[in-house]
UniProtKB/Swiss-Prot annotation:
GO molecular function: adenosylmethionine decarboxylase activity
The protein's name in its UniProt record: S-adenosylmethionine decarboxylase proenzyme
Disulfide feature: none
Lineage: Bacteria, Pseudomonadati, Pseudomonadota, Gammaproteobacteria, Enterobacterales
GO biological process, one term: spermidine biosynthetic process
Keywords: Autocatalytic cleavage, Decarboxylase, Lyase, Polyamine biosynthesis, Pyruvate, S-adenosyl-L-methionine, Schiff base, Spermidine biosynthesis, Zymogen
Gene3D superfamilies: S-adenosylmethionine decarboxylase (3.60.90.10)
Role: Catalyzes the decarboxylation of S-adenosylmethionine to S-adenosylmethioninamine (dcAdoMet), the propylamine donor required for the synthesis of the polyamines spermine and spermidine from the diamine putrescine.
UniProt key word Chaperone: no
Family: Belongs to the prokaryotic AdoMetDC family. Type 2 subfamily.
Textual note on the cofactor: Binds 1 pyruvoyl group covalently per subunit.
Length: 264
């Protein structure tokens, strides 16, 4: 897409929101409480602030304000307001490719925000526990928040990720013509690195005419030892391992597809 000569500021709003899920099996009520306490501490407001602040540093944004809160009994929220440094729109790369990791600081944001909320929870009886982090990066201007995607997924490695990217509003060129998007995109996947894509099953549901893009990700490899809390596979019988594996797989399928799967 050729560079547009705009009349005034770029008024497009670009929002990337995604949920990351960590799934775990904790056999007893005490184990489930222990997992919730553990994951709540791992992703407390201070840790989330560090992650989001590093994100701002990577994409070259100025932090204007930070609001953070840990909740009782669990959960945390962090919101960071940011603004961009001066940037020449002609120097902005809007092509589809993975965004930067900490070693590559290349992007800038404008009058924007980054926020995260966490939601630990557990099944009342089945031993299943899930942790969800809900993250949104919203920008106004020439830069796409998709540049932050690759780093955040690397930082918050998860079993399942669901992402939505949307461009809202319009901007006007010097001839008065409205433009409802200012860059080419056919999939969020084009902004992820190859090594990341190789780890996940991925599926797109896009509404191109509305500038709405949706991608789901679920880990390909399943190793039971990574999903047990306070337990090891060798401590379980073959029957227990099969039952737990079935429970975890069903849980992950339901989250990935966004619907309950009936018992067979």
């Amino acid at each position: 897409m050729s560079k547009l000569k705009l009349h005034g500021f770029n008024n497009l709003t670009k929002s990337l929101s995604f949920c990351i899920y960590d799934i775990c099996y904790a056999k007893t009520a005490d184990d489930r409480d222990g997992y919730i306490a553990y994951i709540d501490e791992q992703y407390n407001a201070n840790r989330l602030t560090e992650i989001l602040s590093e994100t701002c540093s990577i994409i070259g944004a100025n932090i204007l304000n930070i609001a953070r809160q840990d909740y009782d009994p669990q959960g945390a929220s962090v919101t960071i307001l940011v603004s961009e440094e001066p940037v020449d729109p002609r120097d902005v790369d809007t092509s589809e490719h993975p965004g930067p990791l900490p070693s590559a600081v290349v992007a800038h944001l404008d009058k924007s925000h980054i926020c995260v909320h966490t939601y630990p929870e557990s099944h009342p009886e089945a031993g299943l526990c899930t942790f969800r982090a809900d993250i949104e990066v919203s920008t106004c201007g020439v830069i796409s928040p998709l540049k932050a995607l690759n780093y955040l997924i690397h930082q918050l490695e998860s079993d399942i990720v669901t992402m939505d990217y949307r461009v809202r509003g319009f901007t006007r060129d010097i001839n008065g013509v409205k433009h409802f998007i200012d860059h080419k995109i056919n999939s969020i996947q084009n902004f992820m690195s190859d090594d990341m894509k190789s780890l996940y099953h991925m599926m797109d549901v896009n509404v191109y005419q509305e500038n709405i893009f949706h991608t789901k990700m679920m880990l390909k490899d399943f190793d039971l030892k990574h999903y047990l809390f306070n337990a090891k596979p060798e401590e379980l019988s073959a029957e227990e391992k099969e039952q737990i594996t079935r429970l975890l797989y069903k849980e992950m399928q339901e989250i990935y597809y966004g619907r309950n799967v009936p018992e067979v």
